[in-house]
Amino acid sequence: MWLSKFQFPSRSIFKGVFLGHKLPLLVRLTSTTTNSKSNGSIPTQYTELSPLLVKQAEKYEAELKDLDKDLSCGIHFDVNKQKHYAKLSALTDTFIEYKEKLNELKSLQEMIVSDPSLRAEAEQEYAELVPQYETTSSRLVNKLLPPHPFADKPSLLELRPGVGGIEAMIFTQNLLDMYIGYANYRKWKYRIISKNENESGSGIIDAILSIEEAGSYDRLRFEAGVHRVQRIPSTETKGRTHTSTAAVVVLPQIGDESAKSIDAYERTFKPGEIRVDIMRASGKGGQHVNTTDSAVRLTHIPSGIVVSMQDERSQHKNKAKAFTILRARLAEKERLEKEEKERKARKSQVSSTNRSDKIRTYNFPQNRITDHRCGFTLLDLPGVLSGERLDEVIEAMSKYDSTERAKELLESN
């Protein structure tokens, strides 16, 4: 086994953050280092990378040395080779930093055990160095893993209420506001592509949010799934807590809907692959109803995927938006199918982080948000729903995802 026996507390609590039943990043992929001579005097354990991951890093380090020799001989690098060289350089720098911090920890550990006169000072340095070392280890694992195929893409978020009636619609609006707040916090450009409110205007029936920042998909893809809220509705007279849900779909944004000609979109599909229906926009009546045939419905015949768009008064703009969403849905569908085939080929037993079950609970009475995939809990609902502390939840899930992908990589080897 590549995992040594270790002991960790079942739950660690720090500034309102809980790490529950899921183990922290690297633990299941590493051996925990302890020193039996210390008699418990060493304040914090640290974890070493799996030998298989270290071997992979050493392989990249050796490849970089070969490329350095080529450069010193005046061999020209094309654009792709320059990018590969830059990637290897960044990875090797992190690997060197990892080894340096690991050696420092081992030296301090030995000092704590063997030199009582320096023990107090060494223990303090040791405790300060462990989290720095773990952060470096996490960065190294992320660099060793293959990137997500759409990691550099902008993103589209589709939000729809689930069970819970009006309360689910209100919660869907809360989630939309959270993602807008998060985009503002990250200083990302965004646009609401479509938003359909319910009759009372208190919630939304569906919405599509475009995050135009390159790489935002890699960050937000962990938001895909069913979100659950537990709270007392304003209309509840007996003080009972109600449970409602909303579904979030996160897609990579493929193409540029600001293109001057819609022909560019249609040329990406074979003749007869797309059925385009033009119709009059529907709405609440009065000024909300368009008097021209501007609404567009696209049907991708091979897959049966249908996209309708009527938010713009211009048929051209609605068609462009519809093609953008259709291409994003098709790209995500193909990626998921490919992942499923690879998973079956490896006979992997690792659960997918893209499951469409309840991924997260927002509990208002307890001021608690819990991500059920990685066991992360944060006691600050207003901070998360404002978008300002959503990064902490996403980061916990990102680390868990890295752990699972690294585990798959090791098992496949």
Swiss-Prot record:
Plastid keyword on record: no
Misc remark: Present with 414 molecules/cell in log phase SD medium.
Record-given protein name: Peptide chain release factor 1, mitochondrial
GO molecular function, one term: translation release factor activity
Keywords, sorted A to Z: Methylation, Mitochondrion, Protein biosynthesis, Transit peptide
Major location (coarse): mitochondrion
Compartment(s): Mitochondrion
The organism's taxonomic lineage, starting at the top: Eukaryota, Fungi, Dikarya, Ascomycota, Saccharomycotina
N5-methylglutamine carried by residues: Q287
Family: Belongs to the prokaryotic/mitochondrial release factor family.
GO cellular component terms given for this protein: mitochondrion
UniProt record, GO biological process: mitochondrial translation; mitochondrial translational termination; translational termination
One Pfam family matching this protein: PCRF
Record Gene3D superfamilies: 3.30.160.20, 3.30.70.1660, 6.10.140.1950
Role this protein plays: Mitochondrial peptide chain release factor that directs the termination of translation in response to the peptide chain termination codons UAA and UAG.
PROSITE patterns named among the record's database cross-references: RF_PROK_I
InterPro entries documented for this protein: PCRF, Pep_chain_release_fac_I, Pep_chain_release_fac_I_sf, Prokaryotic/Mito_RF
The record's account of how the chain is modified after translation: Methylation of glutamine in the GGQ triplet is conserved from bacteria to mammals. N5-methylated on Gln-287 by MTQ1.
Region (Disordered): 335-363
